[in-house]
Structure formats: C-alpha cells, structure tokens
Amino acid sequence: KSAVIIIDDITRPTPCEPIARAVIAELHAAGVPDENIWFIIALGTHGVMYRTEFVRKLGEELVENYEVHNHNLFFNHVFVGNTSNNVPVEINADVMSADYKIAIGTTMAHSYYGFSGGAKCILPGVSSLRTIMRNHSFTTTTEFNMGNPHTLMRSDAEQAARMMGLDFKVDAILNGHAEICNLFAGDFEAEERQAAAYAAEHYRIVTSSSPTTTSSPPRPTAPIRPRSSPRSRTAARSCSRPTPRSARACTSCTTSGATPPPAA
C-alpha cells in the first residue's frame, strides 16, 4: 500500500511537522513502509516552495527522508468528474496514484469558502488550473460572507474531495502564536463542520452592532531563513520544471548546483 500526505503551503501557519509524524506513525502501524509515503504541497495557484520552506513546514528529518513535491497546476492531472455546478474536477495524478489520501491543514475564516480547512486542500489545493479557474469564477457572480460555510465554492470543493477519494483530514485550530490549541480529524466534511463551529466561536469579535468573525489569528513574524542549506536529493525536487514524480529531480539543478529556477 502507498499513502500521500497533502499539506498546506508556506502562506499558511499550520505547524505540520508534529501532525505529520503522528500520521506517519499510524501509516506504519497499518503496514505502509516509508518508501511508499510521500508529501504533496497543496499550492493551488501559489508559487512553488523550495527546500528551506519544506523544512520550515516539515522539519529537516522528514524532508530528508521522504519525498516532498510541489503541486503543479499546469500538467499531470486525472479527471474524476464534474460537480453539480458543472466544474470539471482534475486532480494531481501523484495524489490520485496513492492508496491512502490524507491531508493536513488549518481552519480559519475565509472570504470565499466560509472557512479554510476541510476539502479546500483538494480544490484549489491539488487541482488543475482549469478546475480552479472555473471554481473561482463564482466569486464574480455570488455574494460571499466570511464565516459562511455554505458557499458554492465550498460545495464544489467538497464534491471534488468526495470524487477523488480523500480518506482522512486533520485540521488544526491555532492561537495568535500559531500554536495548536485544538485538532479535528476524520471525514473531511464532518471534521470541517466541527472545526468551523469552534473557530467561529473563538475567532469572533463581538462589537456593539453585530459579531464579526476574523479571518485568522495574528500570524507571527516568520523566522529568518538560513543563508544556505545542504544540497540533497530533496533540494532538486522543489524545481518547478515539469518531470514525472518518479524522476522529479531536475538534471540541470542537480548536476550544476544551480539554484532551482523560479516559477513562471
């Protein structure tokens, strides 16, 4: 058996390392070996991450010992169906190839999806550009409210996650120092509803007129990145040049020691 662990990117404050270690321990108990476990960064349309950022999310040991890949929204997708809103769902093929599909994220209020977390790791997280653009087109036709869990965009995301077979989701609730103060895990739809209710209660500011749900707890200052990091087999995997997952290391970056090229 094999397993993919989908994690959110560096723009989100989720402390993924301790959660990922717990997930890996459960996978080991289920008989999944290390060589059959890999990570995919749910970038959506965000820029690619490099090795130093992989380490900030997962820690040096996990990055050194497991495959870590950026999602690419331009190629290497599997079509799994259309949502009820007629959005074609195309998912990262490296995600679809795994027997077990697990994701880690954070639940915060979100302008378009009501709350982050839940199925948002799939759409937009590991979807194609076409899927994301069709889903995001609803922002021009539908009125949204932050903290509203019943939006067309979330409906699409949940349908997409159900179609592609997301098995398990872990969502963290963070305090103002980006520390975990609660965790919700299980079926992505059920856990997201519970996490969203908890987040709405704890992130809400009551004013004289009406309560307002804040978008997120304050994000702490990002740590200073190291000036350099060891070049290893994982460093080349952050390269954005399109190659199959099994041969993700970019030849020019690996052989010349050059810095991986920035995203287009």
Predicted features, each with a name:
Residues P13-V32, I224-S232, S238:
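Histidine-anchored nucleotide/phosphate-binding helix
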Residues T83, I91-M96, K101-V170:
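Conserved phosphate- and dinucleotide-binding cores of soluble alpha/beta proteins
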Residues K101-A103, S209, S215, S238:
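Short, well-ordered beta-strand core segments
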